[in-house]
């Protein structure tokens, strides 16, 4: 009888070890089987003028069958035009400000990115302007949207008169950008 009672604690330890091994295997298998989470990296352009429609391109990872954009304001809506391209309408009643946009697709809903509804004319970069002779004209009082390459220079031109005060704002933080801009203003002679 004494040998039987000493075998019980050893048997219990073996059963506990088996249960623990099973649980560890089940947890590992479950984490391997989880679907990827959609990741929205960028929305271009990052905004639009209130009362207009603009074409938006999305870039990210695991955006399989992305078929909708969800905005934090019901007055901003999107229609799928082609994979990763949407027509976004900003209703006249939308207030100037920043709103969240998320992608909805086969794998669920993505992280938010910032989309700005504004009241100024919007210009979107369509080609490189990395040399002074390729500078793009930006009218006063307008917004310029575009993506930049790290450590690259872009050139813009705008009309100005001697002694006139001009305010140039690079709103990177407002649009959730990692860019740290450096601006230099020169006259037509490059001074």
What are these regions (language model features)?
Residues 29-33:
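Boundary at the C-terminal end of the N-terminal hydrophobic targeting segment
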Residues 1-13:
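N-terminal secretory signal peptides that target proteins for export/translocation
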Residues 34-78, 82-83, 92, 96, ...:
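Acidic, Ser/Thr/Pro-rich low-complexity intrinsically disordered segments
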Residues 16-28:
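Bacterial N-terminal signal peptides
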Residues 113-140:
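Predominantly extracellular/luminal regions of secreted and cell-surface proteins
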């Amino acid at each position: 009888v004494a040998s039987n009672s000493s075998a019980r604690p050893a048997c219990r330890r073996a059963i506990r070890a088996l249960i623990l091994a099973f649980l560890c295997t089940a947890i590992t298998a479950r984490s391997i089987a989880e679907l990827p989470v959609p990741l929205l990296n960028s929305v271009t352009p990052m905004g639009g003028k209130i009362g207009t429609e603009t074409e938006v391109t999305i870039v990210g990872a695991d955006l399989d069958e992305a078929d909708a954009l969800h905005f934090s304001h019901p007055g901003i809506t999107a229609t799928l035009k082609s994979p990763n391209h949407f027509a976004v309408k900003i209703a006249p009643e939308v207030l100037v400000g920043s709103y969240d946009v998320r992608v909805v697709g086969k794998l669920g809903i993505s992280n938010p990115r910032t989309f700005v509804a504004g009241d100024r004319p919007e210009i979107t970069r369509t080609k490189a302007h990395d040399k002074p002779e390729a500078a793009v004209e930006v009218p006063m009082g307008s917004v310029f949207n575009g993506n930049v390459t790290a450590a690259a220079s872009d050139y813009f031109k705008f009309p100005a008169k001697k002694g006139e005060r001009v305010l140039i704002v690079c709103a990177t933080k407002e649009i959730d950008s990692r860019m740290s801009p450096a601006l230099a203003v020169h006259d037509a002679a490059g001074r």
